[in-house]
Curated annotation (Swiss-Prot):
Keywords: Cell projection, GTP-binding, Lipoprotein, Magnesium, Membrane, Metal-binding, Myristate, Nucleotide-binding, Phosphoprotein, Sensory transduction, Transducer, Vision. It comes from Bos taurus (Bovine). A lipid is attached at residue 2 (N-myristoyl glycine). Pfam families: G-alpha (PF00503). The keyword Membrane applies. Residues 31-44 are annotated as: G1 motif. One of its GO terms (molecular function) is protein kinase binding. Functions as a signal transducer for the rod photoreceptor RHO. Required for normal RHO-mediated light perception by the retina. Guanine nucleotide-binding proteins (G proteins) function as transducers downstream of G protein-coupled receptors (GPCRs), such as the photoreceptor RHO. The alpha chain contains the guanine nucleotide binding site and alternates between an active, GTP-bound state and an inactive, GDP-bound state. Activated RHO promotes GDP release and GTP binding. Signaling is mediated via downstream effector proteins, such as cGMP-phosphodiesterase. This is Guanine nucleotide-binding protein G(t) subunit alpha-1. Residues 340-350 are annotated as: Interaction with RHO. Gene3D superfamilies: GI Alpha 1, domain 2-like (1.10.400.10), P-loop containing nucleotide triphosphate hydrolases (3.40.50.300). GO terms for cellular component: cytoplasm; G protein-coupled receptor complex; heterotrimeric G-protein complex; photoreceptor disc membrane; photoreceptor inner segment; photoreceptor outer segment membrane. Heterotrimeric G proteins are composed of 3 subunits alpha, beta and gamma. The alpha chain contains the guanine nucleotide binding site. Interacts with RHO. Interacts with RGS9 and PDE6G. Interacts (when myristoylated) with UNC119; interaction is required for localization in sensory neurons. GTP binds at residues 36-43, 146, 171-177, 199, 265-268, 322.
Length: 350
């Protein structure tokens, strides 16, 4: 009888120990949700987590990006060529018209993700054309990848035999996120589970079941989107869409107790763009100076003022450049400290 009882006690103690360990593990598990409109930079943040908190990209993984990079480069020059017609811009050299026609034809016939020499030569000639450059300067009037200039101006390096993509090449590459991508890593004694969710409208209905037990939401908005329209709807300004989405998330009853951090991303693109395009394009009431600081701060205030519970709930915001590893490392470190502080506060230890 006694032996049976002590075995039961032992089993009970083991179970208690296991439950305690599980509870501690749960307390140290951080569920992070990356939300934001399409092309705001969510997937680039995920790539940075791999670089900063995992072991980065192996040679094999880098090589897998070549096809994506070539595909992005081709799509970018094709978008510019098509816009030449729509915007009625003349080529600086009329011979480029033939190059453009040849390129359109080749794009339909080559194997996807490859870059034959004849094609890269044509692309390089087109990119140097003054008409193409004038069209590139008007990129906000049509849909063009942010990485267009980065790849097109460096195409010679990208097509060198034996080319291996650099971390920056990988970070700049773009594949539309469909569905939900989970990344796991450890940092500051916490186990992170980060979920990247497709941002375009058709993808958003998949978010809802991710909402259970979220520790922190990182909402990403592209600062540079103030003069752009949606891929899905060319009547809707991207910044307005982003504000609308942020409003519905930060005031959602699901997230009443969830920490929310706002990344105002693409500050590098924004700092160049604001020199040329006035913020009043997006916010007609804005009559402040058209500088990076003033315009950037005005955008930040537009987001933060949407928080209906700002008397009790603080939303932390950061200006970010998702392709800059040091910047992301610094900001994510600050976010982690916020998460630790908020979690300790919840446990009554802070």
């Amino acid at each position: 009888m006694g032996a049976g009882a002590s075995a039961e006690e032992k089993h009970s103690r083991e179970l208690e120990k296991k439950l305690k360990e599980d509870a501690e593990k749960d307390a140290r598990t951080v569920k992070l949700l990356l939300l934001g409109a399409g092309e705001s930079g969510k997937s680039t943040i995920v790539k940075q987590m791999k670089i900063i908190h995992q072991d980065g990209y192996s040679l094999e993984e880098c090589l897998e990006f070549i096809a994506i990079i070539y595909g992005n480069t081709l799509q970018s020059i094709l978008a510019i060529v098509r816009a030449m017609t729509t915007l009625n811009i003349q080529y600086g050299d009329s011979a480029r018209q033939d190059d453009a026609r040849k390129l359109m034809h080749m794009a339909d016939t080559i194997e996807e993700g490859t870059m034959p020499k004849e094609m890269s030569d044509i692309i390089q000639r087109l990119w140097k054309d003054s008409g193409i450059q004038a069209c590139f300067d008007r990129a906000s009037e049509y849909q063009l990848n942010d990485s267009a200039g980065y790849y097109l101006s460096d195409l010679e390096r990208l097509v060198t035999p034996g080319y291996v993509p650099t971390e920056q090449d990988v970070l700049r590459s773009r594949v539309k996120t469909t569905g939900i991508i989970e990344t796991q890593f450890s940092f500051k004694d916490l186990n992170f589970r980060m979920f990247d969710v497709g941002g375009q409208r058709s993808e958003r209905k998949k978010w809802i079941h991710c909402f259970e037990g979220v520790t922190c939401i990182i909402f990403i908005a592209a600062l540079s989107a103030y003069d752009m329209v949606l891929v899905e709807d060319d009547e809707v300004n991207r910044m307005h869409e982003s504000l609308h989405l942020f409003n519905s998330i930060c005031n959602h009853r699901y997230f009443a107790t969830t920490s929310i951090v706002l990344f105002l991303n693409k500050k590098d693109v924004f700092s160049e763009k604001i020199k040329k395009a006035h913020l009043s394009i997006c916010f007609p009431d804005y009559n402040g100076p058209n500088t990076y600081e003033d315009a950037g701060n005005y955008i930040k205030v537009q987001f933060l003022e949407l928080n209906m519970r700002r008397d009790v709930k603080e939303i932390y915001s950061h200006m970010t450049c998702a392709t800059d590893t040091q910047n992301v490392k610094f900001v994510f470190d600050a976010v982690t400290d916020i998460i630790i502080k908020e979690n300790l506060k919840d446990c009554g230890l802070f």
